[in-house]
């Protein structure tokens, strides 16, 4: 992909670069951790790939979490698109991991067993146990969520679909259908929810989808909302395959 094509819009999906808790193999969810130096470098490279592909985002959508916001800022700077409008919304947040937030993934798997671990981590409609409001990793009284009538205490992927896809259809999709190039910088599970919608992936098969950090995934979408390149195109397919495999292997190493 070298040039933008006005016959269709482009939707660029970018998972945040490696975070501190990606590196330490902890469930993160809505906990607001920072990027590692590797994560910042991934964000730079992601932005460079966007520029090298001839893509020129006209607007950015991201979450309220630092790791996605920072990734977006770095990537846009590298792409020379640092000046475009930015929309931040909680509905692009990572899935809330409930009482698992802060726990090591490998230790959690050892404690509860492979089947329960994978059900919490990858099933479509099985949420982890809810987090207590007084837990240090809960979002109780977090000012960024002051306008929410209720802050989630846990979520499954279905919950993310229910909050994010209506927002996508109302706010983001019309721009893409109109021929714009839109960058969405978000999280593993909010992007899995969107890819499920775009590619019409079944509730069962979505368990096998993993999104690598820092590698842009581009969908071409026409004026009717039809995806012209099912599955999208990673701007670095080899690195994306390796990154997705690394995500799938989480839970192995402590």
UniProtKB/Swiss-Prot annotation:
InterPro entries: His_Pase_superF_clade-1 (IPR013078), His_PPase_superfam (IPR029033), PG/BPGM_mutase_AS (IPR001345), Phosphogly_mut1 (IPR005952). This is 2,3-bisphosphoglycerate-dependent phosphoglycerate mutase. Pfam families: His_Phos_1. It comes from Corynebacterium jeikeium (strain K411). The lineage of its organism: Bacteria, Bacillati, Actinomycetota, Actinomycetes, Mycobacteriales. Its EC number is 5.4.2.11. Catalyzes the interconversion of 2-phosphoglycerate and 3-phosphoglycerate. One of its GO terms (biological process) is gluconeogenesis. Pathway: Carbohydrate degradation; glycolysis; pyruvate from D-glyceraldehyde 3-phosphate: step 3/5. It catalyses: (2R)-2-phosphoglycerate = (2R)-3-phosphoglycerate. Substrate binds at residues 15-22, 28-29, 67, 94-97, 105, 121-122, 188-189. The record marks 187 as: Transition state stabilizer. Belongs to the phosphoglycerate mutase family. BPG-dependent PGAM subfamily. One of its GO terms (molecular function) is phosphoglycerate mutase activity. Keywords: Gluconeogenesis, Glycolysis, Isomerase. The active site is at 16 (tele-phosphohistidine intermediate), 94 (proton donor/acceptor).
